[in-house]
A protein has these predicted regions:
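Transmembrane helical cores of multi-pass ion-transport proteins
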Residues: 2-520, 524, 757, 778-779, ...
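Cytosolic C-terminal regulatory domains/tails of membrane transporters and channels
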Residues: 1-62, 512-795
Length: 795
């Protein structure tokens, strides 16, 4: 039956894998009396599925992770409550004016910012893995929503803007929620820091440029502030003479905000024992400025409400804010509306992800806890799915409010509930006060909030010192945002960063290694280290890196060996080896036309020139795979092609192929599948590394001899080279002498186990592989000399 199966598989071109029994038998013959045999089992597809698919326990953990508050809520205590009360009240005082300001930025009425703020803090704590994050309206997302509304409002005049914004929140929330459910939060890691910094800086400059007209009161001068940032700046400067009394409110409030911040910061350093007091004073500066200028506005405009025959206010005010949740409703999901903003969805989703995950990870590291990015995506998704039922628009994590919450001493995510209560009070009790808030003051609040998101020059210089290319990506991203739009800037920076990543993988340069013997400064420890022959790693160029053996090459991969870089790697290997070695057998062509067109050999065969070539012939190649985490079908096929190419170069000799430092069983399986695990030398002596697992005596283990393995000598067996080296340890000799004097008729032996499988040319490190290759080559050389001597005697 087996013969028929083999014949059928042979017709299909499938080579039946080697039986496990055969491999184990060969392993036993290799191990001999030195060590117990060990043959590495290949991983199976079943094992892969078992590793990837969750078991019952993992599924239970997955379900529990969906509601992280269950892990800590039963331990909630009074001390935590006090910290959460302080932080929640502090953030609540800040989020009310910020929420209304960001709603203005989105082109919506102020109450929608309050709705978004309320839903964000109330919902988030159920799903939070960060105690510091505050979800709500943010400047960048509000700007993006404003751009979308400006584009869609003329097309759908019958649909209110807040319903379009709510529809956008539902769609983006559903996308992010699904990403969280399938646990792909790691995808955010593909967006590097320079791209995030460029996005934040460019967006901040765009927002500031768009708010300056409101700050100065010349927004109604007839120019559009939603175009490219550079055009907004130019138009603002042109209409600067048209500024009005709003500028007095806006500029002075902005100046006061920065003055209070600098004063509180200085006082905290000057009087460190009162640092906490100055922190809260600094945190509440926005609230103080809003209240102060609202009082001024009320004093000036209390009889200028623009209703009941009263004159218009002297400067622009928010106006009437409805009390309560007047816009609660089921979100309107219009297919035509969705079709019109679907092109903006990638940018909107990226904004939701970048700001929230970057902030949560940063504060997690600062406060010594770890967030779950995928669970944070679920939190964002649920918030934006529920929010539109209350009239909210897209929301995500806020940097400024998160920083305030962290510094205020928040203890748990429950602080969001405290903040939500304050927002609820504001929605129901303070709407009459909101009427007198100046729009110019709100513009000052926005400018002051987003100004901190601009990357400092010192940080840009740090980028330049670490990686000039990353610094250029940052600068380019900011310029693109200023001259086009936030969305295009996001796409370009992300795509450029991805292209740089792919280029670095595809054009990864390996290293040919040489040996240097080093020792510690006290001279007690000597070992071999392997450094690049060209010293590109920055090692001392005065050191002479030695080749391991004539015709033996050690090549280190610096990235995974995959389809993108396989040809680049192997081209480096082949080109270098052909330059460093000579062909074992020089082809002789009777006619010039017999020579291949791509063979640049001499026109005529010259034996003297061949004799003068002192380059060695190719003997062995050792690949250091310690940096390789993946191989694929393409890369393994390229490796087979290169093997055949170099085998022809060294023909009729055989080339040994060895692999060191393989860290993944699937890589070993792939190499074994293409027959790269064999030493390719029939005469090769089986060599493998072993490790001592302990010393035993015949009294403790009397079954060893019965099993036929026998005692292993107290001499150390160096299996790598087959050379017995005397163990010159005085302690062992003393113990043996004491045992003899005591008249014990027993012996002791050391037991060794192979580190890797004994039937494959895989080695733990480069040193082991080199020793195995050299031993085989020396063995071949001795046999050739003996054969030559025998031939000479016979003649």
């Amino acid at each position: 039956m087996n013969a028929k199966i083999d014949k059928f598989l042979q017709k299909l071109g499938i080579e039946r894998p080697e039986g496990e029994h055969d491999r184990v038998t060969r392993g036993e013959s290799i191990a001999s009396n030195f060590a117990d045999p060990f043959v590495e089992p290949d991983p199976t597809v079943g094992e892969w599925f078992q590793e990837k698919l969750p078991n019952r326990h993992e599924f239970g953990q997955y379900c529990l992770d969906l509601l992280p508050f269950l892990r800590w809520v039963h331990r909630y205590n009074l001390q935590w409550l006090i910290g959460d009360l302080i932080a929640g009240i502090t953030v609540g005082a800040v989020v009310v004016p910020q929420g209304m300001a960001y709603a203005e930025l989105a082109g919506l009425e102020p109450q929608f910012g309050l709705y978004s703020s309320f839903v964000g803090v109330i919902v988030y704590w159920f799903f939070a893995t960060s105690k510091d994050i505050t979800i709500g309206p943010v400047a960048v997302m509000s700007t993006l929503v404003g751009e979308i509304l400006q584009e869609l409002s003329p097309k759908f005049p019958d649909i209110p803007d807040y319903k379009i914004a709510g529809s956008l929140a539902v769609i983006t929330g559903a996308i992010v929620f699904f990403m969280g459910l399938i646990r792909v939060g790691w995808i955010v890691d593909f967006i590097p820091l320079p791209a995030i910094a460029a996005f934040m800086t460019g967006s901040s400059i765009t927002i500031i440029a768009g708010q300056v007209p409101s700050l100065l009161g010349n927004k109604d001068a007839g120019f559009d502030t939603n175009g490219a940032t550079y055009m907004t700046i130019i138009k603002t400067l042109k209409h600067l003479p048209e500024s009005n009394i709003n500028a007095a409110m806006g500029v002075t409030s902005l100046f006061l905000l920065y003055l209070l911040r600098e004063t509180c910061t200085y006082c905290a350093k000057r009087w460190p024992n009162k640092k906490k007091i100055w922190f809260f004073a600094n945190t509440l500066r926005t609230v103080f400025v809003i209240l102060l200028y609202t009082l001024i506005s009320w004093l000036v405009n209390r009889h200028r409400r623009g209703v009941d025959g009263q004159s218009e206010p002297l400067f622009d005010l928010i106006g009437t804010v409805p009390r309560g949740f007047k816009n609660m409703n089921v979100p309107t999901m219009n297919a035509d509306v969705i079709r019109n903003y679907v092109g903006h969805l990638p940018g909107a989703v990226i904004v939701l992800l970048i700001e929230h995950i970057a902030i949560s990870k940063s504060f997690g590291r600062v406060n010594n806890y770890t967030i779950n990015p995928s669970q944070e995506l679920i939190a964002i998704g649920v918030t934006n799915l529920i929010g539109p039922f209350f009239g909210a628009y897209p929301a995500t994590g806020s940097f400024s409010r998160t920083a305030i919450k962290s510094k205020a001493g928040v203890r748990t995510p429950f602080a969001g509930v405290i903040t939500g209560v304050l927002i609820l009070l504001a929605i129901y009790a303070l709407t009459a006060v909101f009427f007198y808030i100046s729009k110019a003051v709100l513009a000052a609040v926005i400018i002051h909030a987003v100004g901190d998101l601009i990357l400092p020059i010192g940080q840009l210089y740090a980028f330049w010192k670490v990686s000039p290319l990353d610094a250029l990506i940052f600068v380019g991203g900011v310029i693109i945002i200023i001259f086009t739009s936030i969305e295009i800037g996001i796409y370009v920076t992300v795509c450029v960063s991805a292209a740089v990543l792919l280029f670095r993988i595809a054009k990864a340069h390996g290293e040919f290694l040489g040996r240097i013997k080093v020792q510690t400064i006290n001279g007690k420890d000597q070992r071999n280290i392997w450094l690049p022959e060209n010293h590109q790693d920055g090692s001392n160029p005065l050191l002479s890196v030695q080749s391991p053996y004539p015709g033996v090459f050690v090549y280190r991969f610096t990235e995974s060996f995959i389809y993108a870089n396989a040809n680049h790697y192997t081209d480096e290997v082949v080109d270098y080896i052909k330059r460093a070695t000579r062909k074992t057998h020089v082809d002789v062509f009777a006619k010039p036309g017999d020579r291949p067109w791509n063979d640049p050999g001499p026109r005529k065969f010259n034996p003297d020139a061949i004799a003068e070539d002192t380059r060695p012939t190719l003997k062995a190649i050792i690949f250091d795979m310690s940096s390789v985490t993946h191989v694929d079908v393409t890369s393994t096929q390229v490796l087979v092609d290169v093997k055949n190419q170099l085998d022809r170069w060294a023909s009729p000799d055989t080339v040994q192929w060895h692999f060191a430092g393989i860290r993944d069983r699937w890589i070993k399986r792939a190499l074994a599948a293409i027959k790269m695990h064999e030493t390719t030398s029939v005469k090769a002596k089986p060599l493998f590394s072993v490790a001592e697992v302990g010393q035993f005596s015949s009294e403790n283990d009397a079954t060893v001899n019965n099993e036929g393995q026998g005692p292993i000598s107290t001499q150390k067996e160096d299996i790598e080279t087959g050379i017995n080296v005397e163990r010159q340890q005085q302690q062992d000799e003393q113990e043996q002498q004491e045992a003899d004097n005591a008249g014990r008729n027993s012996y002791s032996y050391h037991r060794y186990l192979p580190v890797l499988g004994v039937d494959r040319a895989f080695h733990p490190d480069v040193d082991s592989a080199v020793r195995a290759v050299i031993d085989t080559l020396e063995q071949d050389r001795i046999e050739q000399e003996e054969h030559k001597s025998s031939s000479d005697l016979a003649s």
